[in-house]
Amino acid sequence: MNTTPVIPADEAVIVMTRIYEAPRDLVWEAMTEARHVAQWWGGPGFSNPVCEMDVRPGGLWRHVMRFPDGHELKMNFVFVEVDPPRRLAWREVGHAERKGGLPSCLITVSLEDMGERTGWKMVARFDSIPERDAALAMGFIGPIAASNDRLVDYLRSL
């Protein structure tokens, strides 16, 4: 099943959903342990030479994503909410120093236990509808959908 986006006209959010063919505990582990995240984050051909995660409220997630052409994007996130294995929320920090970066948003991922399957719902909450629209214009959805496709393949390998 593909990642499905919903963009409400009257709310500064992007909502994406997907069903994973894996139990919730395994999906949670793959999303919260750096050794796993480094294997699937980013689109095809991307790698993650640095992925350090302190998964607790206030904890830092430091990430360097290498594009297929070799250039790197450094990202830092702070975890806002951690409720294993149900909810995980984070916000990028330091993005203002990065020229041309996406507008800041709070990402909240909810995992629904469906037995041997897991319902995944991501809500990206922006400060305003114009910021949300700017993120959409910059291609916000594509990389998340591509990462989710890689996560599907990675979960099959576990």
In which residue ranges do the predicted regions lie?
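Hydrophobic ligand-binding cavity/cleft-lining segments
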Residues: 1-47
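Hydrophobic/aromatic beta-strand elements that line small-molecule binding cavities or substrate pockets
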Residues: 18, 50-53, 75-81, 92, ...
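A short, structured loop/turn motif at beta-sheet edges
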Residues: 24-25, 55-56, 80-87, 110-119
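Hydrophobic pocket/interface hotspot
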Residues: 27, 37, 61-63, 79, ...
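Short, highly charged C-terminal tails/helix-capping segments
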Residues: 50, 156-158
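Helix-adjacent hinge/juxtasegments
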Residues: 60-91
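Beta-strand/loop substructures that line and gate deep hydrophobic ligand-binding cavities in soluble
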Residues: 91-142
